[in-house]
Swiss-Prot record:
Disulfide bonds: none annotated. Belongs to the RRP36 family. It is found in: Nucleus, Nucleolus. Residues 85-109 have a biased composition (Acidic residues). Keywords: Coiled coil, Nucleus, Phosphoprotein, Ribonucleoprotein, Ribosome biogenesis, rRNA processing. It comes from the Eukaryota. This is rRNA biogenesis protein RRP36. Residues 60-146 are annotated as: Disordered.
């Protein structure tokens, strides 16, 4: 109660009652005036606010609502079991114990229904799977996985697949499909003619032209690398045949020896200018190695 109501005392005089009524009316009028003034002041404050501050207030309210509605992660219920005594004279069990045992059984059924994955006994142990689980039609068989550098290919030729059980000998495959070089050369010639045709170039964009040039370059380099491998194969075959003419047991070269034989054959069949370039390149390489071994390079 307010201060005025505390000081009021009951009296028989009517003048006192009139004064009390006037006081009440004045108090109510002052209260209504204050409320009107507060509403007007709040409206004026809202008018002066900028859109940026209103937006910030809205985002803060949204964040608080999101925090309030965030899901709470419940911890898994762990049940503990106790040994029960079956003595007839033991009457110490209460109803609370019976209820606890009842709820423990329910929780056990719930965990069984959730089908938790059994943990391994050790990290080296094999993974245990249920025999009731259906086996998928497509499975990853060890030894037949596609390497990462070949996964980007859209199509795969089943003739060269490991699942056939045959060893992939690149020389045999190259002999079988060597006739494809003619088609590759024809494609290269056609692309070169198109890139030299001015009418055709005027009809296409700059991006399409660059793409065609890149394709032509890659086709040429691929064909040249195939031919270089064929040449190296022939060189090594001739060298091994000459070496094993009078030998009862056939001798095969190591990788390092094969590389030396191929380099020697290429150097012998080079022209004079090409030899000079190769010798100059080797000389610069040797000088660079010697320069790195100087004493001032080892200082810190």
């Amino acid at each position: 109660m307010s201060y005025y109501f505390k000081n009021l005392k009951p009296d028989l005089n009517s003048d006192v009652e009139e004064d009390d009524g006037n006081l009440l009316e004045s108090i109510m009028a002052n209260k209504s005036k204050r409320e009107i003034d507060e509403q007007e002041s709040s409206d004026d404050e809202l008018k002066t606010l900028s859109f940026g501050s209103l937006k910030k207030a809205e985002t803060i309210i949204d964040e608080e609502d999101f925090k309030d509605t965030k899901p709470v992660h419940k911890k898994p219920i762990t049940t503990t079991y106790r040994e029960e005594s079956f003595d007839e004279d033991d009457d110490s069990e209460d109803k609370s114990d019976e209820d606890a045992g009842f709820f423990e059984e329910d929780s056990e059924d719930e965990t069984h229904h959730g089908q938790k994955v059994p943990k391994k006994k050790s990290k080296h142990a094999p993974i245990e799977q249920s025999s009731k689980k259906r086996v998928p039609r497509v499975r990853n068989i060890p030894g037949l996985e596609i390497p990462r550098n070949k996964r980007s290919n859209l199509y795969q030729d089943i003739r060269f697949d490991k699942s056939t059980g045959k060893a992939l000998d690149s020389s045999i495959i190259r002999k079988r499909y060597q006739f494809l070089d003619e088609y590759r050369e024809k494609e290269i010639d056609e692309l070169q003619k198109l890139l030299q045709d001015r009418k055709f170039l005027s009809k296409i964009d700059q991006g399409e032209r660059e793409e065609m040039e890149q394709r032509l370059k890659s086709m040429k380099s691929r064909l040249q690398s195939m031919k270089n491998k064929d040449l190296e194969r022939e060189i090594l075959k001739e060298y091994e045949n000459d070496m094993n003419k009078n030998n009862n047991t056939r001798y095969h070269l190591k990788k390092s020896e094969k590389r030396k034989v191929v380099q020697k054959w290429k150097f012998d069949h080079m022209k004079a200018k090409q030899r000079e370039k190769v010798m100059e390149r080797k000389r610069k390489k040797r000088l660079g190695k010697e320069f790195k071994q100087f004493e001032f390079h080892n200082r810190r």
